[in-house]
């Protein structure tokens, strides 16, 4: 079997492939014309790869490769400032070698895409500001999911530090009608009818409240309550059936009922703050997180010492993993989508940093190597095992 590590960065997508033994890696890129790529996923059956991204200049879109990342085609969902400039000055655009494109369907509504998911023959893509789209033709065309895009509570949603972003999309392996999304900072939403209707799922379990549930943020507002966790969800991972793990702005959580209630599993970690969370593909009780020192303290590893924390009992206890990671003067950030595992029997664990490194472990996190460095800021890491 071969593993491909799919990397989204501020300067395009990269693909890192192994030699079949995860010992010798090659990397290609940057792909996607240097667009900022927030998320890259692949289909192990067809080999297709999709990269979602964009910004105010480029617009928003999904790049698709049908040959493992060698060539790419763009499906644009919204136009950007560059497209307006091309229309206003076609002669200058010709000199720079760019050509006018057709008006994209969601121009004026959508700024960028932040997440993409492939399952059951359908793609979903999440965007900014807090929008969801679907495609049934491998990403060639896209439709808005109005159940969330026209949600009755939408006018009350508040954005996180990066704005109102729909950054996480979870799918149920068995039931294509079930999905969960995370929006910063509106919270978690779930649908069981293919996206037609949605309900919020931010309720705490009935356990006693911990101090970090109720958080006075720098904006002067209180986040979380005696009955709800804070709505600034950073990342979620589906571990099968109704088991979901979540890294929140204000702690790490576990749900055993499909997100209908959340129990805190932060005790034992050095911080309530972090971005990614990953789960073992064959053992739903094994998870990894990378805590940062806090939202206002620099967002780097506590004590400037890189550590990946692992639990083998669904978050009841945690163990720090440090071998091979920077032990001092480490000020990188690991962003919300920048950690993943492959599907091998002994899965590889990978994470990327905003300083451009990819770290990998092939023994469950006990030891780490750095198979890639000096990349642009790493925004996402996913794997494709085939």
Give residue spans per PLM region.
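Extracellular glycan-interacting surfaces
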Residues: 1-386
